[in-house]
């Protein structure tokens, strides 16, 4: 570019336009520039520049000299001009080269003159030239800056540019001017400041507002925006340097900013205390009180009052000295420019005129202000000092805009407020707390607010609610702050109310549309709130997780501590919020009832229980009702009275005039209405005033009277109802007293009177505030600021009142701003995710209400979709925060809105609800948890509607067909993949949730199965999802299956066989699938899987189902036999249940498979399931359907035993039950036991074949494997296997086996006992310890009344002795003999003695025991065996107790052939025989009948092979009672007695067997014991058979019949006894051992004594016979002759030595028998003489 080319061209254009004599000054100035530029010098550019710079200062005003002066000094001027031109040319040659001072003047003078010409072309050329000079940085200076470089010329040229534009200027000129101005402001060297800057902005304003060209308007607006942005960017670049300057000045001068910083720092340090609101109970500083005072004033007055207050505050800041922020002197240039621009914008936005120009100006100002606030950098938002300097202007402008009637202005107010919320909330905390209710809540709460204004606010909220951090900050700093309103909660609650607004039928379509838009926008705001919370939670949780992971990886110890301290922040705010809520509740309670309110405060520890704390609370809490404060202070109780005293004492009245003091006193409360209360309060006031002002009044009474008079005067003067008014003299007289010294001075009284009459005593709050307080409902936020919400509906009485209130608030607000301003306060920023929970708790329910009501009453699709988004977000956030109640409420509401339960009422919105619900199942299935039941019920209902044409046809009943078809089609689509995904996604659920899912689906399926007809949709899905989830870990699957199994059991037991079959088949499929998974040892999952089959098999009544179950199990065995492990247990349990089936085909099919498993897959059944296999076989052996199966089952049991014996069952699988077992204990014995027990049970089967087979297998198994059994196992076998076989024998009663005719069972029992005894003998060494219980068994049976049982048991005993006696040890023999002895005593028929009631005269043979029961008692006798003495007699202490068994069995022993007697009478009634004096006790007919019966039975010859005792036939022959009814007449008691008699005979046979076979094996004590036992038998029988007893009985029976007797027992016992004694005494030798000598001596003594006794009794009878001819004696002798004969025969074989030794005793007795009439006796006597006496005679 040529040097100065653009400038030369511009000047040429100007010269051309100013040709001739026009504008001569301009021509001269241009000519001067051109003349100087023609001379070109070759000097170095640097020298020229230096020369010009040096000369520039002196030639600055040379161009301004007169023309003649120039002519006279032409040479000098020419030289200077040449030098300057050369310098200008060099500077203009390159951009960025600036001109010097003189050069600037040389260039600018033509431009200034050009602007004065008013010629457009010259204008344009000059503007273009100036634009290039500034743009190329040729001009450098600071226009508008005092003392700045080139300030004056640049200011002038800018002013001229600004002034050359007016309304008539062409557009091109206007655009050129705008270009120059923008370039000037934007230039880095041409820096515009101060007034020039404002002038530039003013020109742009005028163009934007007044230009008729839209292009110019738009351009000017754009340039204004750029200029403002440039100004604030410059300010931001100066922040660092300005901050350092301010810091230095603060350090030196100590201005007001330093205390400000200190205050903020202190607040930061005490953040926790302030947050928790503890300062409420402490004395507040002046600033805090003033801020709250401001809030109260704002809350109680209208917007006009607030405007006035802020206006006065703004005017205060127009001076140089600003009380807060930054002083102008300390500001940087950029900050001052920004401050000027900012204030200018605010002031232009504050204008009050309502004309069009003013409105446009305000709109533009607010628009620019908003754009500026939006465009500044983030660092500017933190420049607290600068913001403090401008926030009063900003607040005022915003306040004026927020109350403007213009909707456009209000929209900009909303926009500006949104910027403050989003960007400046931390620096304008107090202002936001004030304007949020004014702009947002007031507009939304006011029903009369225009819809367009509401829409503006809602659009603003839509924007700001998308900022999650903003919402969190608002909640933390306001809702959790005790001193602030609940902005977040109130905002959401208000939006919720708007969204729920009633749908009124507005006749105006436009209004209806606007109302709908308002609702939709409010709903959008609510959704944005929820979405923001969701987003913030997600972001912060991810950040916290990252931080936590970083901390875990870090080795630093400081970081975790810091993290922990940060994590405490949310809990602190949560506590603060709870504290605030409690405080609000307390204040609300106080405003209802002051006494209860104070108690509430104390109970919740909000204030201490002392009067000073309560008084401080009453004074400092502005939201308390002044009326209720007065009411509380007037109470007469002790504590309120103390509070009133403390309240008054806390006030200071020093140096205050009386009327001022009483005004100050009554500001805080309203006096109560009762005179006594007023009296107490004013009395205390007078006392306090006098104390603070001593000497003013003589005493307090004077002050009290005056105070009372002032109250009366105030009421009189300002109450319009009072007339006439009190005069000054009246007031003076009212205070007069008799003592002039006690009266107040007249001057004081007159002063008070004038003051009160002129100005009423009022409360601190004005009348409006009082009305609002009285009308405010309980529960509103603390502080008067809340009443801003009601500013749209002012409640005033008159215009005068309004004016008074406004003036009051203006005055007080002005004072506050002048002294303190609004305290910024501590702004908290929380980043911990836990803060979200209390936020959701605060607004969750209003959100749910808004969504629910909208869904319920509306059909607007956009709003419905918003509701769906809200439901989705609400469910998500409630889930992630663990808020189960809220999550459940959201979910259940969403489920309810599907309307699947009422298809007729369904609409498209319900389809959307269903769509969202299914979408949640797909995207966030974890959130459903305890609502799965409702969700799955919806899916079930959906399938039912779609699959049922009749139901589908009713959908959306009443709508047009197109809509209905659309809804049905949508339902079909949802029933497809979306519904299917609900089940497919079950695999994504965590363990807990998937269990809930299965549980819910089972519940839904159960309900489906209850329907008619039953449905299986959910059952099918159960099977499907079971397949999906079968791969889960076993622990989870086990929990799932515990739920499934119960349901499958229920379904498998359904009354509809088709459903039951489907359930069972599904079970089979699942079982097959699960069996594919390998199972390790000791796990039981397979068993759990198959267990439902077992339960159904056991419980179902359907043959088809049972058959199907068996088929399923058979199929599973055949296909998965190698995979079955623990499942065998359930398999065998199923077959076990099948074994009891009544259908033979099921039994056979089951058994065939069991047989196949055992024969082919026995190795699979080993281990834990072996016992189940055995139990199954045992159950089959017990089946009733087929004997063949039973026998084969027993055979399979034997096979199992063989496999077990072969070692196929690994040892160690089952541990011994008793850990203290011997080391040699064989674990496999636990496998033996179930088999043995089963076989033992089978031995009592009713089928002989089965019974015998089981018996043979059992004992065969024991004999074959018994040598490997341990001692404990043998003991278990005897007690639990073998002995129970004979339970039916040992418990046999009257209904015996013989009576049933089952002879085979008797044979089995005999055989069993024999096998038992053989087994005992076979393994005697192993089981010898079992002899006592074995003997106990046998002899217990021997004590029974059933003759068959007795015969079987004693026969087995004899067999045991005969076969195994040779192995018995000495102890065994002792045990055996002791048992026999006990049995002999127990089975003695003692009832016989009692029944006949006789006395035995022979003391040495009588039974000493008392008889305590009659013949009807039980045969059981509990006798202690130790009562039997060595001599065989029963001690006197043994008194057996007799009881009766009602079910005793009849004897099985047939009557002897030679026994005969007639049939007795059947009468059973007792009759006394008074004629028979020989009887001690009268005999009943029944007893005589019993005697006859026993005579018949006991004298008969038995044919039983068990007892081979022969008794000589009696000479008396009786008819054999073969009548079939003779046994039927026998009573149970008689049967028991007869059984005992037979038992005695059998026991004698057992003893006989012992002495015959094992006598030589016995020791001396055992032999003596046998003698004693035999003697006891003989003793009892002989006592019953004694002469006196027989004779007594003979008198009661017919003479042709023998009397009752025990001759057979006596004879048998005598025979064996004599045999034993003779065997013992037959071998007397001199060389015998001591023990043998003792035995033989005892035997000799017993033998001699016994023989002598029998002979003596017989000889005595013979003597009696000789003396008399009594037939009774003959009959007695005849009956007893067999015994006598046996004794005589025994004596024939007596040892000769013994006989000779006792010849002297025997001989007299024997000689008496020579004359005996019984031939048998005489024959026996002859043989005795021949055997014993003949040898003696020969000697």
Swiss-Prot record:
Induction context: By the pathogen elicitor flagellin 22 and by benzothiadiazole (BTH), a synthetic activator of the salicylic acid (SA)-dependent immunity (at protein level).
Catalytic residues identified in the record: 674
Subcellular location: Cytoplasm, Cytosol; Golgi apparatus, trans-Golgi network membrane; Early endosome membrane
Compositionally skewed regions (Basic and acidic residues) per UniProt: 57-69, 1417-1432, 1516-1525
Record-level GO cellular component terms: cytosol; early endosome; early endosome membrane; trans-Golgi network
Predominant cellular place of this UniProt entry's protein: cytoplasm
Pfam families named among the record's database cross-references: BIG2_C, DCB, Sec7, Sec7-like_HDS, Sec7-like_HUS
Domain SEC7 span(s) in chain numbering: 572-759
Gene Ontology terms describing biological process: auxin-activated signaling pathway; defense response to bacterium; endocytosis; immune response; innate immune response; intracellular protein transport; regulation of ARF protein signal transduction; regulation of auxin polar transport
Residue list for modification N-acetylalanine: 2
Region feature (Disordered): 44-82, 243-262, 543-571, 1415-1477, 1504-1532
MF annotations from Gene Ontology: guanyl-nucleotide exchange factor activity
Membrane topology summary: Peripheral membrane protein
Post-translational modification (record): Ubiquitinated.
InterPro entries reported for this sequence: ARM-like (IPR011989), ARM-type_fold (IPR016024), DCB_dom (IPR032629), Mon2/Sec7/BIG1-like_HDS (IPR015403), Mon2/Sec7/BIG1-like_HUS (IPR032691), Sec7/BIG1-like_C (IPR046455), Sec7_C_sf (IPR023394), Sec7_dom (IPR000904)
Keywords from the UniProt entry: Acetylation, Auxin signaling pathway, Cytoplasm, Endocytosis, Endosome, Golgi apparatus, Guanine-nucleotide releasing factor, Host-virus interaction, Immunity, Innate immunity, Membrane, Protein transport, Transport, Ubl conjugation
Disruption phenotype: Inhibited trafficking at the trans-Golgi-network/early endosome (TGN/EE) leading to an increased accumulation of PIN2 in agglomerated intracellular compartments leading to an altered auxin gradient and subsequent growth defects (e.g. disrupted roots architecture and shoot growth). Increased susceptibility to Pseudomonas syringae infection. Displays growth and polarity defects.
Regulation: Inhibited by brefeldin A.
UniProt biased composition (Polar residues): 44-54, 70-82, 546-557
Job description of the protein: Activates the ARF proteins by exchanging bound GDP for free GTP. Plays a role in vesicular protein sorting. Acts as the major regulator of early endosomal vesicle trafficking, particularly at the trans-Golgi-network/early endosome (TGN/EE), but is also involved in the endocytosis process. Together with VPS45/BEN2 required for polar PIN-FORMED (PIN) proteins localization, for their dynamic repolarization, and consequently for auxin activity gradient formation and auxin-related developmental processes (e.g. embryonic patterning, organogenesis and vasculature venation patterning).
Oligomeric and partner information: Homodimer. Interacts with hopM1. Interacts with HLB1.
PANTHER family (UniProt xref): BREFELDIN A-INHIBITED GUANINE NUCLEOTIDE-EXCHANGE PROTEIN 5, GUANYL-NUCLEOTIDE EXCHANGE FACTOR
Name of the featured protein: Brefeldin A-inhibited guanine nucleotide-exchange protein 5
Organism for this UniProt entry: Arabidopsis thaliana (Mouse-ear cress)
Encoding gene (name): BIG5
């Amino acid at each position: 570019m040529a040097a100065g080319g653009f400038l030369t061209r511009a000047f040429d254009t100007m010269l051309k336009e100013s040709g001739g004599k026009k504008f001569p000054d301009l021509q001269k100035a241009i000519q001067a520039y051109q003349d100087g530029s023609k001379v070109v010098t070759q000097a170095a550019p640097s020298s020229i520049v230096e020369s010009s710079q040096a000369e520039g200062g002196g030639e600055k005003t040379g161009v301004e000299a007169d023309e003649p002066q120039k002519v006279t000094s032409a040479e000098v001027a020419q030289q200077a001009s040449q030098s300057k031109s050369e310098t200008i040319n060099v500077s203009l040659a390159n951009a960025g080269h600036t001109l010097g001072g003189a050069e600037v003047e040389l260039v600018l003078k033509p431009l200034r003159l050009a602007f004065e010409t008013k010629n457009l072309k010259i204008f344009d050329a000059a503007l273009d030239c100036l634009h290039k000079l500034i743009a190329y940085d040729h001009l450098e200076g600071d226009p508008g800056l005092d003392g700045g470089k080139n300030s004056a010329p640049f200011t002038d040229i800018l002013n001229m540019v600004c002034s050359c534009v007016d309304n008539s200027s062409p557009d091109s000129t206007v655009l050129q001017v705008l270009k120059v101005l923008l370039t000037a402001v934007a230039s880095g060297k041409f820096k515009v400041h101060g007034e020039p800057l404002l002038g530039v902005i003013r020109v742009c304003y005028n163009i934007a507002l007044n230009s008729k060209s839209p292009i110019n308007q738009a351009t000017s607006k754009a340039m204004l925006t750029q200029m403002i942005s440039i100004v604030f960017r410059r300010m931001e670049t100066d922040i660092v340097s300005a901050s350092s300057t301010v810091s230095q000045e603060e350090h030196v001068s100590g201005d007001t900013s330093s205390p400000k910083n200190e205050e903020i720092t202190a607040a930061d340090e005490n953040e926790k205390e302030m947050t928790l609101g503890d300062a409420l109970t402490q004395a507040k500083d002046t600033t805090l009180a003033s801020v709250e005072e401001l809030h109260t004033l704002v809350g109680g007055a209208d917007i006009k009052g607030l405007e006035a207050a802020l206006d006065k505050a703004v005017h205060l800041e127009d001076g140089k000295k600003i009380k807060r922020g930054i002083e102008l002197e300390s500001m940087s240039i950029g900050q001052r420019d920004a401050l000027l621009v900012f204030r200018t914008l605010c002031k232009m936005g504050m204008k009050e005129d309502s004309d069009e120009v003013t409105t446009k100006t305000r709109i533009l100002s607010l628009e620019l202000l908003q754009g500026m606030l939006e465009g500044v950098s983030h660092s500017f938002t933190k420049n607290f000092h600068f913001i403090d300097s401008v926030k009063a202007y900003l607040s005022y402008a915003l306040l004026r805009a927020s109350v403007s009637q213009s909707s456009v202005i209000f929209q900009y107010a909303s926009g500006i407020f949104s910027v403050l919320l989003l960007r400046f909330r931390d620096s304008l905390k107090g202002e936001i707390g004030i304007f949020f209710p004014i702009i947002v809540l007031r507009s939304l709460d006011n029903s009369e607010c225009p819809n367009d204004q509401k829409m503006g606010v809602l659009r603003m909220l839509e924007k700001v609610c998308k900022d999650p951090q903003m919402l969190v900050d608002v909640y933390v700093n306001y809702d959790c702050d005790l001193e602030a309103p609940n902005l977040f909660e109130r905002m959401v609650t208000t939006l919720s109310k708007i969204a729920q607004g009633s749908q009124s039928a507005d006749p105006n379509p436009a209004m209806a549309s606007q109302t709908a838009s308002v609702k939709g926008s409010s709903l959008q705001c609510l959704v944005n709130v929820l979405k923001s919370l969701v987003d913030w939670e997600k972001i912060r949780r991810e950040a916290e997780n990252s931080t936590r992971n970083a901390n875990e990886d870090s080795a630093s110890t400081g970081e975790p501590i810091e993290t922990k301290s940060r994590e405490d922040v949310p809990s602190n705010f949560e506590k603060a919020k709870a504290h605030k809520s409690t405080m609000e509740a307390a204040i609300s309670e106080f405003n209802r009832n002051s006494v209860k309110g104070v108690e509430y405060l104390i109970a919740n520890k909000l204030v201490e229980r002392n009067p000073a704390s309560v008084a401080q609370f009453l004074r400092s809490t502005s939201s308390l009702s002044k009326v209720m404060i007065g009411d509380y202070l007037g109470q007469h109780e002790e504590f309120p009275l103390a509070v009133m005293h403390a309240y008054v004492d806390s006030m200071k009245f020093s140096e205050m005039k009386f009327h001022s003091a009483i005004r100050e006193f009554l500001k805080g409360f309203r006096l109560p209405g009762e005179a006594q209360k007023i009296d107490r309060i004013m009395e205390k006031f007078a006392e306090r005033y006098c104390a603070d002002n001593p000497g003013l009044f003589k005493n307090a009474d004077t002050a009290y009277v005056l105070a009372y008079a002032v109250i009366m005067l105030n009421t009189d003067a300002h109450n319009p109802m009072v007339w006439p008014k009190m005069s000054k003299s009246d007031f003076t007289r009212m205070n007069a007293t008799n003592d002039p010294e006690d009266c107040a001075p007249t001057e004081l009284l007159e002063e008070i009177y004038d003051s009160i009459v002129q100005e009423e005593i009022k409360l601190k709050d004005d009348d409006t505030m009082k009305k609002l307080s009285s009308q405010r409902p309980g529960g509103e936020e603390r502080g008067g600021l809340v009443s801003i919400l009601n500013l749209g509906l002012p409640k005033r009485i008159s215009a005068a009142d309004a004016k008074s209130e406004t003036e009051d608030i203006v005055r007080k607000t002005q004072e506050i701003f002048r002294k303190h301003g609004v305290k910024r306060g501590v702004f908290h920023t929380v980043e911990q995710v836990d803060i979200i929970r209390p936020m959701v708790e605060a607004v969750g329910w209003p959100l749910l209400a808004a969504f629910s009501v909208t869904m319920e009453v509306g059909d607007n699709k956009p709003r419905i979709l918003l509701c769906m988004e809200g439901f989705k977000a609400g469910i998500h956030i409630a889930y992630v925060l663990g808020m189960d109640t809220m999550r459940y409420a959201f979910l259940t509401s969403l489920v309810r809105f599907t309307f699947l339960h009422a298809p007729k009422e369904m609409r498209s919105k319900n389809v959307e609800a269903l769509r969202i619900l299914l979408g949640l199942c797909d995207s966030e299935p974890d959130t459903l948890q305890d609502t799965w039941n409702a969700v799955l019920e919806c899916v079930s209902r959906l399938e039912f509607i779609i699959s049922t044409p009749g139901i589908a046809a009713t959908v959306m009943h009443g709508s047009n067909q197109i809509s209905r078809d659309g809804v049905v089609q949508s339902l079909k689509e949802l029933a497809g993949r979306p519904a299917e995904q609900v089940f497919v996604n079950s695999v994504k659920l965590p363990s807990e949730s998937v269990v809930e899912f299965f549980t819910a689906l089972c519940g839904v399926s159960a309900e489906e199965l209850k329907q008619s007809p039953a449905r299986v949709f959910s059952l099918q899905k159960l099977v499907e999802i079971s397949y999906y989830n079968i791969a889960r870990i076993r622990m989870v699957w086990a929990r799932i299956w515990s739920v499934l199994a119960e349901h499958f059991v229920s379904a498998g037991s359904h009354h509809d066989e088709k459903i039951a079959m489907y359930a069972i088949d599904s079970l089979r499929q699942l079982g097959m699938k699960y069996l594919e998974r390998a199972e390790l040892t000791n796990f039981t999952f397979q068993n759990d899987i198959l267990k439902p089959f077992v339960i159904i098999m056991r419980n179902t009544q359907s043959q088809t189902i049972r058959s199907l179950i068996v088929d399923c199990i058979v199929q599973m065995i055949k296909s998965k036999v190698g995979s079955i492990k623990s499942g065998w247990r359930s398999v065998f349990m199923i077959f076990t249940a099948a074994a009891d089936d009544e259908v033979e085909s099921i039994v056979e099919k089951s058994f065939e498979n069991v047989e196949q498993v055992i024969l082919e897959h026995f190795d699979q059944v080993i281990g834990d399931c072996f016992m189940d296999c055995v139990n199954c076989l045992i159950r089959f052996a017990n089946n009733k359907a087929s004997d063949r199966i039973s026998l084969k089952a027993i055979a399979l049991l034997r096979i199992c035993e063989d496999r077990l014996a072969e070692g196929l069952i690994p040892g160690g699988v089952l541990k011994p039950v008793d850990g203290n077992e011997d080391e040699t204990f064989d674990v496999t014995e636990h496998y033996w036991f179930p088999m043995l027990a089963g076989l033992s049970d089978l031995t009592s089967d009713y089928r002989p074949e089965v019974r015998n087979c089981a018996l043979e297998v059992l004992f065969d198994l024991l004999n074959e494997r018994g040598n490997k059994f341990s001692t404990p196992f043998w003991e278990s076998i005897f007690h639990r296997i073998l002995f129970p076989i004979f339970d039916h024998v040992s418990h046999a009663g009257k209904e015996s086996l013989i009576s049933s005719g089952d002879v085979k069972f008797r044979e089995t029992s005999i055989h069993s006992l024999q096998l038992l005894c053989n087994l005992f003998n076979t393994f005697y060494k192993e089981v010898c310890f079992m002899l006592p219980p074995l003997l106990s068994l046998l002899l217990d049976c021997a004590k029974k009344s059933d003759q068959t049982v007795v015969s079987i048991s004693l026969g087995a005993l004899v067999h045991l002795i005969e076969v195994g006696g040779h192995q018995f040890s000495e102890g065994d023999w002792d045990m055996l003999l002791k048992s026999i002895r006990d049995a002999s005593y127990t089975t003695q028929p003692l009832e016989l003695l009692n029944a006949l009631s006789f006395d035995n005269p022979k003391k040495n043979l009588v039974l000493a025991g008392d008889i305590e029961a009659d013949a009807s008692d039980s045969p059981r006798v509990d006798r202690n065996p130790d009562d039997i003495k060595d001599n065989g007699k029963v001690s006197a202490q043994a008194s057996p107790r007799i009881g009766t068994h009602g079910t005793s069995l009849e004897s099985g022993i047939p009557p002897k052939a030679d026994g005969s007697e007639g049939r007795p009478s059947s009468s059973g009634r007792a009759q006394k025989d008074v004629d028979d004096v020989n009887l001690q006790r009268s005999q009943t007919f029944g007893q005589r009948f019993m005697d006859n019966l026993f005579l018949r039975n006991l004298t008969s010859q038995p044919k039983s092979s068990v007892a081979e005792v022969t008794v000589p036939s009696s000479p008396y022959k009786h008819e054999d009672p073969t009548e079939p009814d003779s046994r039927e007449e026998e009573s149970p008691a008689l049967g028991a007695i007869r059984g005992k008699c037979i038992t005695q005979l059998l026991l004698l046979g057992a003893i006989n067997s012992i002495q015959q076979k094992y006598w030589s094996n016995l020791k001396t004590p055992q032999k003596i014991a046998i003698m004693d036992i035999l003697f006891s038998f003989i003793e009892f029988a002989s006592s019953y058979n004694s002469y006196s007893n027989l004779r007594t009985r003979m008198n009661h029976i017919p003479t042709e019949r023998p009397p009752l007797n025990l001759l057979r027992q006596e004879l048998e016992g005598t025979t064996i006894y004599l045999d034993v004694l003779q065997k013992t005494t037959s071998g007397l030798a001199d060389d015998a051992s001591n023990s043998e000598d003792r035995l033989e001596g005892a035997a000799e003594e017993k033998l001699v004594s016994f023989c002598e006794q029998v002979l003596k009794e017989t000889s005595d009878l013979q003597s009696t016979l000789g003396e008399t001819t009594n037939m009774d004696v003959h009959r007695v002798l005849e009956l007893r002759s067999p015994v006598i004969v046996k004794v005589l025969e025994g004596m024939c074989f007596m040892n000769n030595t013994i006989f000779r030794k006792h010849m002297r005793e025997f001989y007299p007795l024997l000689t008496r028998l020579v004359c005996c009439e019984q031939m048998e006796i005489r024959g026996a006597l002859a043989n005795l003489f021949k055997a014993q006496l003949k040898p003696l005679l020969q000697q």
